[in-house]
Amino acid sequence: MIGSSVVVRTRSWIVLCLGLLVVGSPAALAADCPGHPDALGTSRTLVVDPREHPRIGTMQYRETLPLKDHEVVLTFDDGPLPKYSNQILKMLDDECIKATFFIIGEQAKANPEGVRKLIAAGHTVGTHSMNHPLTFDRMPLDKAETQINGGISGPRPR
């Protein structure tokens, strides 16, 4: 079984490596999103160092990210699924918003064009393991590592 400290360290490491995109205030919108005066927001990249915020990425959510007033973090899990991912990408683009997409390795392998679209649109892409087993807490460490690494090490989109 995976100990909770392994899960916390793994999640913290992933957050550190990925950074997060944060939806900000409309004040900076004009410079970041020309031609969309009525768009909802803009984005900034927020890199979270787990040494400074060790609780980020844990299941308990006892600590939040260092956000400004009216900021939220948008994340989407378990894609890319062409039907839904394309709709979400259009909505985000229409409003000049960036997000983080945690994709499943098997979905990425089946839909590499979807991953390319996420990256080309400027979104952050992270892993949600190879096939998103719901039994991580009861899985032997070597199998969990294979799941995590399989989601990370798939073919790079070109």
Language-model regions, residue ranges each:
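Boundary at the C-terminal end of the N-terminal hydrophobic targeting segment
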Residues: 28-31
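Active-site acidic/histidine proton-transfer and metal-coordination neighborhood
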Residues: 158
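Active-site beta->alpha N-cap acidic-glycine motif
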Residues: 40-143, 147-154
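Bacterial N-terminal signal peptides
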Residues: 12-24
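Bacterial N-terminal signal peptides that target proteins for export
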Residues: 2-15
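N-terminal module-boundary/linker segments of secreted carbohydrate-active enzymes
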Residues: 34-36
